[in-house]
Amino acid sequence: MASQAPRDFEAQALGLVPIVVETSGRGERSYDIYSRLLKERIVFMVGEVNDQTANLVVAQLLFLESENPDKDISLYINSPGGSVSAGMAIYDTMQFVKPDVSTLCMGLAASMGAFLLASGAKGKRYALPNARVMIHQPLGGARGQASDIEIQAREILYLKDRLNHLLAHHTGQDVERIARDTDRDNFMSSEDAKAYGLIDHVSTKRP
């Protein structure tokens, strides 16, 4: 009989999603691990924030709201950030749905990832002890004619101001400090992020 260990290692190396098998009186039912955790109202946002990941997160938030509008949803974040527009789609949906959306950073929440981490329900924003959080201003990469660059520059300045005001709202910091602190990449430990108001708790163990 072949050893199971090499097969498990091969599955991990290929990036395959583990399958969970549950047995009940009705027989066996298999789920991929993320679908099983979705039943526990846990949503993952891992990797770059883009239109695809935003669509997946938004769809799961809306589905869980339809399942039970009064039970909290947990959003687990490990993301270097990405598209502002995609991130704002997630942000607006988090504020739109009726259940509180709790956020938890595992690994890294940077840029839009940090913004979404801070946007969780007040008192329900967490980070694991060795997680890192990074805030900065929106990045621009304008190209084209001078008039096009001017239009894009105005849009970036608008987004910067809008994000600063929202981050000030969620952290309790004043907008001027947010503007200063996001002028360059600003990395924080979990404890620093808590002191800044980006999260409420550093979690070493599940409550």
Swiss-Prot record:
The active site is at 111 (nucleophile), 136. Keywords: Cytoplasm, Hydrolase, Protease, Serine protease. InterPro entries: ClpP, ClpP/crotonase-like_dom_sf, ClpP/TepA, ClpP_His_AS, ClpP_Ser_AS. One of its GO terms (cellular component) is cytoplasm. Its main location: cytoplasm. It is an enzyme of class 3 (hydrolase). PROSITE patterns: CLP_PROTEASE_HIS, CLP_PROTEASE_SER. One of its GO terms (biological process) is protein quality control for misfolded or incompletely synthesized proteins. It is found in: Cytoplasm. It catalyses: Hydrolysis of proteins to small peptides in the presence of ATP and magnesium. alpha-casein is the usual test substrate. In the absence of ATP, only oligopeptides shorter than five residues are hydrolyzed (such as succinyl-Leu-Tyr-|-NHMec, and Leu-Tyr-Leu-|-Tyr-Trp, in which cleavage of the -Tyr-|-Leu- and -Tyr-|-Trp bonds also occurs). One of its GO terms (molecular function) is serine-type endopeptidase activity. The keyword Protease applies. Its EC number is 3.4.21.92. Cleaves peptides in various proteins in a process that requires ATP hydrolysis. Has a chymotrypsin-like activity. Plays a major role in the degradation of misfolded proteins. Fourteen ClpP subunits assemble into 2 heptameric rings which stack back to back to give a disk-like structure with a central cavity, resembling the structure of eukaryotic proteasomes. Belongs to the peptidase S14 family. This is ATP-dependent Clp protease proteolytic subunit. It comes from Burkholderia thailandensis (strain ATCC 700388 / DSM 13276 / CCUG 48851 / CIP 106301 / E264).
